[in-house]
A protein has these predicted regions:
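Central cavity-lining transmembrane alpha-helices of secondary-active solute carriers
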Residues: 47-62, 242-254
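Cytoplasmic helix-loop-helix junction between adjacent transmembrane helices
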Residues: 99-135
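Symmetry-related core transmembrane helices of the 12-TM Major Facilitator Superfamily/SLC fold
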Residues: 159-177, 360-382
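Conserved MFS/SLC helix-loop-helix module at the cytosolic interface between two early adjacent transmembrane helices
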Residues: 55-94
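Extracytoplasmic gate region of multi-pass secondary transporters
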Residues: 24-25, 201-249, 338-343
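Helix-breaking motifs and short loop linkers at transmembrane-helix boundaries and internal kinks
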Residues: 36, 68, 89-94, 123, ...
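Helix-loop-helix hairpin linking two adjacent transmembrane segments in secondary transporters
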Residues: 124-125, 129-184
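Extracytoplasmic
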Residues: 5-39, 115, 222-227, 338-342
């Protein structure tokens, strides 16, 4: 087993996932104009990737121990390929809906396989390596937003932008086809399937799953919908996503030192506090301060997703691949519901106020998420210190 090749292939698979978010965030307005879609329709299309993701993630998490990782990665490849091509040749709302669903299903399968894969091949350093793996999510969004920005200014269109995803898709498909996969940690350790499902009912796991709803909404709703919400405030609203994602990429690359200094629970508490400040600034500032706000927000959400997954992998290992998948699926499902609700809310606000105030109102409404998380993670920090000291 070549764990370096497996890790590199996993990173390329996550690049495809993140490009789908970054590029789609950058072309939402183009799609809306080209196909004459309403605000509600475009928010539903954007949300589809988020509920296709959890469906696939839960199914993948339940099957990965039985079928093995390799067949599920082939399925992820086919979903990605079909979704990209269907988007390029879309002719209206329904084809965009279906193509986004396919990409979401592919994205979920990547997470369902690659999270337990990384945890299995780096058992001695799970949280750090999951942060290194997940740096390619904001890293891919940086690439995606840069592609979207450059291609739009060159008038190359949204179809060409979607086509760029085919290169990393081909790379991860080739690498995985040539590499042998390990069994998951749960299978290796001999934990029964019944015990794995029983461990999903542990109070600590349920607490982390509920917190995942808030961390995912704070990070992913804001990132995916920021061009729509703030395009009236800044001519280059997509660059706000570029800056916040760039900060996240750098931060996750430096995760090893942060994990040793703060511990995972300290990282989560600090992330919640800083993301509260960042989201508040995004909702209240304009001009050059918007880009400063984006950097603060990016720093705040940097460690949310991988550290939540890493915490479960390290402290609740008997929940297995299903536990990691349920965490991610819960977060993505929450984002899909929240995005659809906020799409209708935003559309209603535009009738009563200008676009600028409507976008800011949506962000201010979302602010309660990191505020609640700050209190929750403060409690978790105290609890884990007492438990580890016992």
């Amino acid at each position: 087993m070549d764990r370096r090749s497996l890790f590199v292939a996993s990173c390329f698979a996550l690049v495809v996932t993140s490009l789908s978010f970054g590029i789609r965030a950058g072309i939402l307005n183009d799609l809306q104009g080209h196909f004459a879609l309403t605000d509600s329709q475009i928010s539903t299309i954007a949300a589809t990737a988020f509920w296709g993701f959890p469906i696939s993630m839960v199914i993948g998490g339940m099957l990965v121990d039985r079928l093995g990782m390799k067949p599920l990665m082939y399925l992820a490849f086919l979903m990605h390929l079909g979704g990209i091509l269907l988007t390029i040749y879309a002719n209206g709302y329904m084809s965009l809906f279906l193509s986004t669903l396919m990409i979401g299903l592919g994205n979920g399968m990547v997470e369902a396989v690659c999270n337990p894969l990384v945890a299995s091949i780096y058992p001695e350093n799970k949280t750090t390596k999951l942060n290194h793996f997940h740096l390619w999510f904001p890293g891919g969004i940086v690439l995606g937003t840069l592609i979207s920005f450059v291609f739009t200014n060159l008038d190359w269109g949204w179809k060409a932008q979607m086509g760029t995803m085919l290169l990393p898709l081909a790379i991860y498909g080739y690498l995985f086809s040539k590499t042998e996969f390990p069994v998951t940690e749960r299978v290796k350790s001999g934990v029964s399937e019944a015990d794995m499902y029983k461990n999903l009912l542990q109070p600590l796991f349920l607490f982390m799953m509920i917190c995942m709803l808030g961390t995912a909404i704070t990070e992913l709703f804001t990132g995916q919908y920021i061009d729509v919400l703030l395009h009236s405030v800044s001519e280059n609203a997509i660059l706000i996503l570029f800056i916040s994602s760039g900060v996240m990429t750098l931060g996750r690359g430096l995760a090893e030192g942060v994990v040793k200094t703060l511990t995972p629970t300290g990282m989560l508490l600090g992330s919640a506090v800083v993301s509260t400040l960042g989201l508040y600034l995004l909702a209240t500032q304009d001009g050059g301060m918007l880009f400063v706000s984006a950097a603060v927000f990016g720093l705040g959400v940097t460690f949310f997703w991988p550290t939540m997954i890493g915490f479960v992998a390290e402290n609740l290992p008997n929940t297995g691949a299903v536990g990691l998948s349920v965490m991610g699926a819960a977060g993505m499902f929450a984002v899909s519901l929240y995005m659809q609700a906020m799409g209708g809310y935003y559309e209603g606000l535009v009738g009563d106020m200008n676009d600028v105030e409507a976008g800011r109102t949506v962000l201010r409404t979302t602010l309660f998420m990191p505020i609640v998380l700050s209190a929750a993670f403060a409690g978790l920090y105290v609890y884990m210190r007492k438990r580890n000291a016992a």
